[in-house]
Amino acid sequence: MASSSSVLLVVALFAVFLGSAHGIAKVPPGPNITAEYGDKWLDAKSTWYGKPTGAGPKDNGGACGYKNVDKAPFNGMTGCGNTPIFKDGRGCGSCFEIKCTKPESCSGEAVTVTITDDNEEPIAPYHFDLSGHAFGSMAKKGEEQNVRSAGELELQFRRVKCKYPDDTKPTFHVEKASNPNYLAILVKYVDGDGDVVAVDIKEKGKDKWIELKESWGAVWRIDTPDKLTGPFTVRYTTEGGTKSEFEDVIPEGWKADTSYSAK
């Protein structure tokens, strides 16, 4: 029978081995992807999760706070970006063209995905953990499962402007816990840069803009001892510096857990 000291030594050596292996596997993230657009393609690794033809998360949500990403306008063409893509929530809503050329089942044609979630797997400087549907969309027609069977792919990507259908307008979802002293707003369906770096609101009849703070994902909030009175005009600034203003988009008598879209 092995002595207790021998057993402890084996356990310790095994732990060192695992720690070393884990350390070797870690790849530092690349520089943040910014709101710059062009023809240059960058290299990345891609994996997929969830159902083979699904939108990723079981609840069709993700770390950005969006819901129903399996439905229009996202239609399951979504992905989790690693640190330089997700950017602690500031990458939420940004759009990317992605493509793969290997294995042979890859079409080599670019498809567009929207960042709706994050991933922290340190396997490459840039890593997209895609929905099963988005991953399979890089395949030749009829060979989607062959691509998904690869599990992990080398791909090329570039940031592109987001283009939503004409009937999909910027939308502001007032989060569940909101009340006159606490207002949290999720911003989605932003054309152009897609991601938002600042949100302000203004009460009807007042000149002062009230700055909201980042809460999490694509959610912005304000806590105030003074009761807020709707309607609210909302202004957001995208990463590229574009400001957009939506007058009285959140109406008087607004309700929590309700979405309000621009006209």
UniProtKB/Swiss-Prot annotation:
<feature type="glycosylation site" description="N-linked (GlcNAc...) asparagine">
    <location>
        <position position="32"/>
    </location>
</feature>
<feature type="domain" description="Expansin-like EG45">
    <location>
        <begin position="61"/>
        <end position="167"/>
    </location>
</feature>
<protein>
    <recommendedName>
        <fullName>Pollen allergen Lol p 1</fullName>
    </recommendedName>
</protein>
<comment type="similarity">
    <text>Belongs to the expansin family. Expansin B subfamily.</text>
</comment>
<keyword id="KW-0325">Glycoprotein</keyword>
<dbReference type="GO" id="GO:0005576">
    <property type="term" value="C:extracellular region"/>
</dbReference>
<feature type="domain" description="Expansin-like CBD">
    <location>
        <begin position="181"/>
        <end position="262"/>
    </location>
</feature>
<keyword id="KW-0732">Signal</keyword>
<dbReference type="InterPro" id="IPR036908">
    <property type="entry name" value="RlpA-like_sf"/>
</dbReference>
<keyword id="KW-0964">Secreted</keyword>
<dbReference type="InterPro" id="IPR009009">
    <property type="entry name" value="RlpA-like_DPBB"/>
</dbReference>
<keyword id="KW-0020">Allergen</keyword>
<dbReference type="GO" id="GO:0009828">
    <property type="term" value="P:plant-type cell wall loosening"/>
</dbReference>
<dbReference type="GO" id="GO:0019953">
    <property type="term" value="P:sexual reproduction"/>
</dbReference>
<dbReference type="InterPro" id="IPR007117">
    <property type="entry name" value="Expansin_CBD"/>
</dbReference>
<dbReference type="InterPro" id="IPR007112">
    <property type="entry name" value="Expansin/allergen_DPBB_dom"/>
</dbReference>
<feature type="signal peptide">
    <location>
        <begin position="1"/>
        <end position="23"/>
    </location>
</feature>
<dbReference type="Pfam" id="PF03330">
    <property type="entry name" value="DPBB_1"/>
</dbReference>
<dbReference type="InterPro" id="IPR036749">
    <property type="entry name" value="Expansin_CBD_sf"/>
</dbReference>
<dbReference type="InterPro" id="IPR007118">
    <property type="entry name" value="Expan_Lol_pI"/>
</dbReference>
<dbReference type="Pfam" id="PF01357">
    <property type="entry name" value="Expansin_C"/>
</dbReference>
<dbReference type="InterPro" id="IPR005795">
    <property type="entry name" value="LolPI"/>
</dbReference>
